[in-house]
Curated annotation (Swiss-Prot):
Transmembrane spans: 934-957
Taxonomic source organism: Saccharomyces cerevisiae (strain ATCC 204508 / S288c)
Primary localization class, coarse: membrane
Signal peptide positions on this chain: none
Name of this protein: Uncharacterized membrane glycoprotein YNR065C
BNR repeat residue intervals: 21-32, 67-78, 307-318, 404-415, 607-618, 686-697, 727-738
One cellular component term from this protein's GO annotations in UniProt: membrane
Protein's cellular compartments: Membrane
GO term, biological process aspect, one: Golgi to endosome transport
Biased composition annotated in UniProt, kind: Polar residues: 1084-1093
Compositional bias ranges of the Basic and acidic residues kind: 1073-1083
Family annotation (Pfam families): Sortilin-Vps10, Sortilin_C
Residues the record marks as carrying a glycan: 35, 336, 553, 846, 985
SUPFAM superfamilies xref list: Oligoxyloglucan reducing end-specific cellobiohydrolase (SSF110296)
Length: 1116
């Protein structure tokens, strides 16, 4: 194995000091490979190793090279890419053979092209190489004598056995050239067992010295004292590791455990453990580190004292800052073990191990402005700090912000850019950045009222490019950067980039409710789309707007829902359900017209979508409340009686979301059942376990909630009311129990747990009024003892009944083009633990496309019948715009009115987004004609060739079968079967057969025609005889009068048909079950045209053909 690292005590880490090492004994010993970090890959089962440094210039020259070893890393050879472009920076090195047995490698990299005059980088280009070692050692294949036995762990016992493995000798001059097979180990059990063969027994845990000591919580859980009548019990602290194969067990001295110190078995309340901590000052800030290693968190009180806990708040230690108060705590959003505490005296305390240790550094000599840090997504120690320069006072004329850059976690800072108030490491955010070193900054000069957006690829040491001269602000989300730019008439425009270089204006749909683009809120992005709220009413206290969604590059938006509620600060009642695709909950203003006219206050209703905004429905209310009383919604439609929930705009803490990413399908909400949303204090608490399809009222009144053990434990606590109890459920909300956690009632301000909602400990922050000092308290409530065991995890969901794959709710059909099943716990008596359960789902099958897999395209709206129609007075998106973005294209297509939802993976089926006729891109007309024009020369040659063949065949038959036998005149005398024809050889016989066959067909056709003609004449004669005495126009007058009018009518019908076939499609579709593609092309023109011919029309006129025949005749 190859690894990148450094030699030291582990207290410091420097990316620039990383080296590469190799081990060929499973990590037991290591050898130095190279004095740099880079990419590496192996081939031929480890007998070929390739290493490429990240920096091609680390060896002092500009020429790119790679290093390889053919003796398992003992010696290395350098290979210069002599014909290559210099300074190729690698980003991928792979062995394309999946099992690593191949001898070929693919190396991909990038190189920069520079301006010869300024020596500045003009562009980045990619390059790819294939490295082939198949001819190494003169293509010799290894034989049996080239292999050796290798002892795992240097021949020591591992899990009670010694193992050997067959591999190629290190100095063998050959390649194995065989596909990888599962390891075939020679296993020999060890005679005696050692300490490495043992682990702590269930009732014990290891201390800091590695000794197994009793854990009384686990002892109570194991019930060992219940099986003993004595006051103590002897328990062995060690047990043999399961699967260990050593033969002779080690002698273990048991430990005497006093049973009177163990809690007796009783109710569930007595199994739950509560730990209380008191504080003299209120805890204002608290946040967990988002890791699975432990339950570490940082807390900060109102006077600047910081506290650290590593067990979910059970034991809390005050952080020693040597008297310095902490003014701010910032967590690194990209590296979950890192946090920074800013001191009031200019010190910064940083930790990279969840608060177990801290490093102290000095901030730049600048005034702390309280601006948030901006971090690099790829370098843990790189971030930007904002300080005030020349700031004796914030109001000083010379006071301005400066962006300071650190690359060593705050040990040293360099001044990066004056007047910068917000920067982003843009190059680390994009999937395909134009330059990974790019930094973008918003600059606000005190002498100017405007803000500009600038970028640099060298931290503004020399490169400083102005992107926009005047902006309102910008932000990044999901691989996009969106910039708000002021426009004329107090409007805004949004510009989007996905690489940091090319910016495109975001096109918002127009409508009657969108008069001006004055404000918008970016709601986030997910899987190729940006969600955005465009304000349509900015009356204070009555704000609302349209919910929009973009295409994959964020430039074209469509309207998903109208009148979505927002507040004055721009927050929107919009929330995506975590862990599930395409489920969104919003609150809409149902009386928007009257609100816009200031005639009524807002009336909010809650809506939900299960297909990413294409279709919306009101929440289905439960039939009964938590007391068993029926809701009055049985015979009322959902638009008049449904469930409504208070949303994002009313939250005290934005971290308190409806759902949890680990408790799949579960959501809590405070709301009511009725025709509109009631005030918060009049509402109750509701729960869904199937992603919002069905809901249950679980408690009267508003409650705070929290999820534990991936939803295996649910906890509720009353909101805005003093209490001494919580309610909890261990069966996914089916039943609830109350637990008293304290003696005196307190006002619980918040309840939290780890961000992954996987822990069994909950932390409550409460305030006990009228109790003097120590009135601010935390309560850690531990549910670890209420479960019998930990669930046995099986990714297949088959071996045990603890987990199984199942669909969510009743949605067994397709959603986003596939059927998905989730791995969920089935046994309520076990706990899940830190297993990332939300990551385990499977697609049962992909589905055919249906209407639900499409949404309306730009400037199209969804009509009441479900079809997408063009907004009156507007046009669809200009398809030619794509030609500007992709210069290599020669054609574009007009919109069909539909576009596929980015989340959908459907294949086949309905194709509502099918392209219409192509159009040439501007300037590409010639290439377009060449692509679609017919090659007339080739077709003419084929046509002439066919005519010549037919003419030659006809002439040959005439010459050999007709002319030589006397010409056409003789055939009037020849009967079939006559032997008078000349037949000298086989060719003559074949020709004469053809002639006889033609004569036979001619005679039959002639006879049939004569019989038909005679029959028609007899039938016509009978009709004239029957109707000849009736009054009416003569046959000749019909021909000269009315029939000429009918002919004109047929001519008009032909014109109508032409206009019909040229009409555009209205994009409407029938219901899915009734959809038949072939019916769309079924015309009604094959029905006979109505006629004004009177009853006296002679019989022959009855055979006039319908309009469609007339059209064909006229065309002929």
């Amino acid at each position: 194995m190859l690894m990148t690292g450094s030699v030291g005590d582990g207290s410091e880490f420097d990316w620039e000091d990383q080296k590469t090492f190799i081990s060929r004994d499973g990590g037991l010993t290591w050898r130095f490979v190279h004095n740099s970090s880079g990419l590496y890959a192996t081939g031929d089962l480890g007998n070929i190793i390739v290493y490429i440094p990240y920096d091609p210039e680390e060896d002092g020259d500009f020429q790119s090279e790679f290093y390889y070893s053919l003796d398992q890393g003992r010696t290395w050879n350098e290979y210069e890419l002599t014909n290559a472009i210099s300074s190729v920076h690698p980003y991928k090195l792979i062995n394309p053979t999946p099992d690593g047995s191949g001898s070929k490698f693919i190396f991909k990299g990038t190189f920069a092209t520079t301006d010869s005059e300024t020596n500045s980088i003009t562009s980045l280009k990619g390059v790819e190489y294939i490295i082939d070692f198949s001819a190494a050692f003169d293509s010799r294949t290894c034989e049996e004598e080239d292999f050796e036995d290798w002892d795992l762990a240097d021949g020591k016992c591992v899990n009670g056995a010694k193992y050997k493995y067959r591999r190629r000798k290190q100095d063998a001059q050959c390649l194995v050239k065989k596909a990888f097979k599962d390891l075939s180990l020679d296993e020999t059990p060890c005679n005696s067992c050692g300490e490495s063969d043992y682990e702590c027994s269930f009732e014990f845990v290891r201390d800091a010295n590695g000794l197994c000591i009793p854990d009384y919580n686990l002892i109570a859980f194991s019930n060992i004292c219940d099986k003993s009548k004595d006051k103590s019990v002897l328990v062995e602290p060690l047990q043999l590791i399961k699967g260990d194969e050593c033969k002779t067990p080690m002698k273990i001295e048991p430990v005497d455990i006093p049973c009177d110190e163990i809690p007796e078995e009783g109710s569930s309340d007595r199994e739950i453990v509560t730990t209380e901590n008191k504080f003299d000052f209120e805890i204002k800030f608290y946040q967990y580190f988002d890791t699975v290693a432990d339950e570490s968190l940082v807390m900060l009180n109102s006077i600047g004292d910081a506290y650290i806990s590593h067990d979910g708040g059970q034991t809390i230690k005050r952080f020693d800052t040597n008297g310095e108060k902490i003014v701010e705590v910032v967590f690194n959003p990209y590296f979950n073990s890192s946090a920074y505490l800013f001191g009031s005296k200019g010190n910064i305390f940083s930790t990279h191990d969840r608060g177990h240790s801290f490093m102290i550094a000095k901030l730049p000599e600048a005034r702390q402005l309280g601006m948030p840090l901006d971090f690099s997504a790829k370098a843990q120690d790189t971030f930007i700090y904002y300080g005030g320069k020349n700031c004796e006072s914030i109001l000083s004329p010379e006071c301005h912000a400066v962006a300071y850059l650190t690359k060593d976690g705050g040990e040293t800072f360099t001044e990066m850019l004056d007047n910068a108030i917000h920067c982003e490491f843009a190059g680390t955010l994009f999937e395909y950045p134009s330059n990974e070193e790019m930094v973008m900054c918003q600059v606000k000069k005190k002498s100017s009222e405007t803000r500009s957006l600038v970028s640099s690829i060298d931290f503004f040491q020399g490169d400083n490019k102005i992107i926009f001269e005047n902006i309102i602000g910008y932000l990044s989300t999901g691989g996009y950067i969106i910039v708000a730019v002021p426009h004329e008439d107090n409007e805004l425009r949004a510009y989007v980039t996905i690489d940091g270089t090319e910016f495109a204006e975001a096109k918002f749909p127009y409508g009657q409710d969108v008069s001006k683009q004055e404000a918008f809120t970016i709601l986030g992005s997910e899987k190729g789309s940006i969600f955005l709220h465009l304000a349509t009413n900015l009356e204070s206290g009555h704000d609302f707007g349209n919910l929009l969604k973009s295409n994959s590059n964020g430039t074209s938006f469509v309207t998903l829902e109208h009148a979505v509620n927002r507040n004055t600060f721009g927050y929107v009642d919009f929330e995506k359900v975590q862990g599930l695709e395409g489920i969104i909950i919003t609150n809409i203003v149902s009386n928007r017209e009257k609100v816009g006219e200031n005639k009524e206050d807002e009336q909010l209703k809650t809506k939900i979508t299960f297909n990413d905004g294409s279709d919306w429905n009101f929440l289905k209310p439960p039939k009964k409340d938590s007391e068993g009383k029926k809701f009055p919604c049985d015979s009322v439609s959902l638009d008049k009686c449904s469930l409504h929930l208070h949303g994002y705009t009313e939250r005290k803490d934005i971290r308190d979301t409806y759902s949890s990413g680990s408790a799949l399908g579960m959501m809590f909400g405070v709301g009511n059942v009725g025709d509109k949303l009631l005030p918060y204090e009049e509402c109750s608490t509701f729960l869904t376990t199937d992603g919002g399809e069905t809901w249950t009222e679980v408690k009267k009144g508003p409650h705070q909630w929290e999820y534990g053990d991936h939803g295996g434990v649910l906890v509720l606590v009353p909101e805005n009311a003093e209490t001494d109890s919580i309610s909890y459920s261990t069966d996914f909300g089916k039943t609830w129990k109350d637990y008293k956690f304290c003696g005196d009632k307190v006002l619980v301000k918040d309840i939290i747990t780890v961000p992954r909602d996987s822990a069994l400990r909950f932390l409550l922050f409460g305030e006990a009024k009228n109790m003097g000092s120590g009135s601010f308290r935390t309560y850690t409530i531990d549910f670890r003892n209420i479960f019998e065991r930990q669930c046995e995890f099986d990714i297949t969901g088959k071996k045990r009944a603890d987990f199984k794959y199942s669909p969510l709710g009743s949605r067994t059909g397709c959603l986003f083009g596939h059927q998905t099943e989730f791995l969920r716990k089935t046994d309520e008596k076990c706990f899940i633990g830190n297993i990332p359960l939300s990551e385990f789902s499977r697609n049962v099958k992909n589905c055919s496309c249906t209407r639900q897999d499409f949404e309306c395209d730009y400037n199209f709206y969804k009509a009441s019948d479900g079809t997408c129609k063009l907004v009156k007075g507007l046009s669809s998106a200009n398809g030619a715009d794509i030609c500007k973005k992709e210069p290599d294209l020669i054609e574009y297509y007009d919109s069909s009115g539909y576009r596929k939802i980015p989340l959908s993976t459907c294949k086949g089926g309905l194709k509502l987004d099918a392209h219409l006729a192509p159009h040439p891109c501007p300037g590409k007309e010639k290439a377009f004609r060449e692509k679609y024009s017919i090659n007339t020369g080739a077709y003419a040659l084929v046509f002439v060739t066919i005519l010549l063949v037919i003419f030659f065949a006809a002439w040959f038959v005439y010459d050999r079968g007709i002319r030589r036998n006397g010409g056409f005149s003789r055939f009037e005398e020849i009967r079939l079967g006559d032997d008078g024809l000349i037949e000298n050889n086989r060719t003559d016989r074949v020709v004469n057969i053809i002639v006889r066959l033609g004569l036979c067909i001619s005679l039959i056709t002639k006879s049939a025609f004569q019989r038909t003609k005679a029959g028609v004449a007899r039938f016509s004669s009978k009709l004239r005889a029957r109707f000849g005495n009736r009054k009416g126009p003569t046959y000749s007058s019909l021909l000269q009068g009315q029939f000429s009018d009918e002919s004109d009518g047929l001519h008009e019908d032909a014109n109508d048909l032409s206009s019909f076939t040229s009409q555009d499609s209205n994009f409407e579709i029938e219901q899915e079950d009734a959809y038949r593609p072939e019916q769309e092309h079924t015309s009604q023109i094959d029905q006979p045209a109505t006629s004004n011919i009177p009853d006296a029309l002679p019989a022959r006129s009855a055979i006039h053909k319908p309009d469609s025949t007339a059209v064909r005749n006229e065309d002929e």
